[in-house]
């Protein structure tokens, strides 16, 4: 996940990670399994470098491809429920994980295809524009 994040920061979000001393710490007591933290890691680094606070009522999940796509992940329903219990008002998820049942939940679900969409939803109130380099596959 971290390698993909560094590539996406450089190619699609105009940040060259080599220009910064980036240290990621995943505490040993926190279980981390699979690639679903890719989007969150990218937003964390982006917001730190840009000095932008992320609303703590927004949760997000999704695998990040090297081409900037937000890929589907497993366990989406329990992740949304955990975010809701933790106080999230909005959860950003991969579009491929969307289910119509989400319309009935008491939490706002935003389904996205690309990392630029995630950034726009997270930093939109600040009026920041990101470059969009869409690649056809």
Where are these regions (language model features)?
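Peripheral, non-AAA+ core regions of ATP-driven protein-machinery
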Residues: 1-137
């Amino acid at each position: 996940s971290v390698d993909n994040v560094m590539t996406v920061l450089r190619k699609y979000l105009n940040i060259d990670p080599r220009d910064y001393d980036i240290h990621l710490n995943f505490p040993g007591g926190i279980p981390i399994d699979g690639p679903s933290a890719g989007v969150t890691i990218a937003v964390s680094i982006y917001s730190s470098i840009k000095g932008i606070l992320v609303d703590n009522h927004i949760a997000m999940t999704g695998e990040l491809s090297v081409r900037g796509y937000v890929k589907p992940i497993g366990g989406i329903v329990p992740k949304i429920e955990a975010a809701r219990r933790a106080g999230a008002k909005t959860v950003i998820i991969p579009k491929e994980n969307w289910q119509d049942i989400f319309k009935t939940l008491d939490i706002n679900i935003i389904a996205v295809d690309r990392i630029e969409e995630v950034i726009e939803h997270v930093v939109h109130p600040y009026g920041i524009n990101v470059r969009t380099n869409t690649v056809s596959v």
